[in-house]
Regions:
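Glycine-rich phosphate-binding loop and adjacent beta-alpha segment
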Residues: 18, 26-29, 35, 82-154, ...
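Adenosine-nucleotide cofactor-binding segment
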Residues: 16-83, 137-140
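C-terminal capping/lid region of NAD(P)-dependent oxidoreductase domains
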Residues: 146-147, 151-160, 168-187
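Single conserved hydrophobic/aromatic residue that forms the stacking wall/gate
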Residues: 1-7, 11
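Active-site loop of short-chain dehydrogenase/reductase
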Residues: 6-7, 71, 92-97
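Short conserved AdoMet
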Residues: 4, 68, 92, 178-179
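Short loop/turn segments at beta->alpha junctions
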Residues: 80, 163-166
Length: 187
């Protein structure tokens, strides 16, 4: 299974491979550098997130300023919490807001009138259910990713290779969120 960070890197790779622009939000400068090195067009370091309405408004304005059209066609949100509403406010007309998870902890409450004002859609993306309910489509996606990997259109970030006998160390690294990219176990 992929960690949230690994899914984000894979999505960013697929977005870039399809010719779209990737604006990425991260919590630290270290992650920002990695995203820039791996081709993100813009990177926003959001730190601990907006703490009040003014900070949320400023965060949304910063997000909008990085878009070309004054709003995004697609927002992929694995974070939720206090980041969700400012991100949704940065969506463009007829944009799609993909709800992927709630890594920041709290399930956000969005003012539903924003969907009306922006003609936007909120879409739940739950890969676990998708694999069973839409098996054939999932297989097509996996084949597409494998093809992109084989021709070098996407390149996973391998942050560390660890001998198989140290698998426990690898699991601990991933569990502590101390890894950006993939940890590969080798014989």
């Amino acid at each position: 299974a992929m960690s949230r960070r690994q899914r984000q890197m894979c999505i960013r790779d697929r977005v870039k491979a399809k010719g779209a622009r990737a604006v990425v939000g991260v919590s630290t400068e270290e992650k920002a550098k990695i995203c820039r090195d791996y081709g993100a067009d813009e990177v926003i370091v959001y730190g601990t997130g907006p703490k009040d309405k003014e900070e949320a408004k400023a965060f949304s304005a910063e997000l909008k300023s990085k878009s070309i059209k004054g709003g995004y066609d697609i927002i992929y949100d694995p974070i939720g919490d206090c980041y969700a509403e400012p991100a949704f406010r940065a969506i463009g007309w007829k944009g799609k807001y993909l709800v992927v998870g709630f890594a920041a902890g709290q399930i956000p409450k969005l003012p539903i009138n924003l969907t009306l004002l922006k003609g936007a859609s909120v879409v739940g993306v739950f890969w676990g259910a998708f694999t069973g309910r839409e098996f054939e489509e999932n297989q097509k996606n996996i084949s597409d990713i494998n093809r992109m990997l084989s021709v070098g259109e996407i390149k996973p970030l391998i942050s560390k290779e660890i001998p198989m006998e140290n698998a426990v160390e690898a699991i601990q690294m991933i569990g502590s969120r101390g890894v950006v990219g993939k940890v590969v176990l080798v014989n």
